[in-house]
Amino acid sequence: MSEPTSRRPAYARLLDRAVRILAVRDHSEQELRRKLSAPVMGKNGPEEIDATADDYERVIAWCHEHHYLDDERFVMRFIASRSRKGYGPARIRQELNQKGISRESTEKAMRECEIDWSEMAREQAVRKYGEPLPSNFSEKVKVQRFLLYRGYLMDDIQQIWRNFAD
């Protein structure tokens, strides 16, 4: 039987928590730090883990060392996941920025992902508005606004009608 959590050192409790968090899905380092520093729900309500900054650094280092935490892998999987859900490059970049991923890492991963964003934009437009895509101005504006909200770039959106006209 395991010993009560109050008797376990803060480092051990943090490490256990980090592994449980990372077992569910990949996280960026910043996300993991935020989740580790948040209070834990205990039997008597939220409980703080009385860990030092050194404990947090040791846990993060352990996760990197044992390949539980890898920002590059996280970025590639995040881009693949969000693009499968129909989101464009601008929105994905913004979400990665919010998750603490550097602009350089994001741009490198976006170049390596080999996704045809204009084709994805067309698929999203067809899924929402049907085939053939609207050709009158007011309907085109609706499609454009929808795709911009989903995070597609204006060049990719305009490419839809250029290819459609050909």
UniProtKB/Swiss-Prot annotation:
It comes from the Bacteria. Coiled coil: none annotated. One of its GO terms (cellular component) is cytoplasm. It is found in: Cytoplasm. One of its GO terms (biological process) is regulation of DNA repair. The keyword Transmembrane helix does not apply. Keywords: Cytoplasm. Modulates RecA activity. NCBIfam families: PRK00117.1-1 (NF001052). This is Regulatory protein RecX. It comes from Salmonella paratyphi B (strain ATCC BAA-1250 / SPB7).
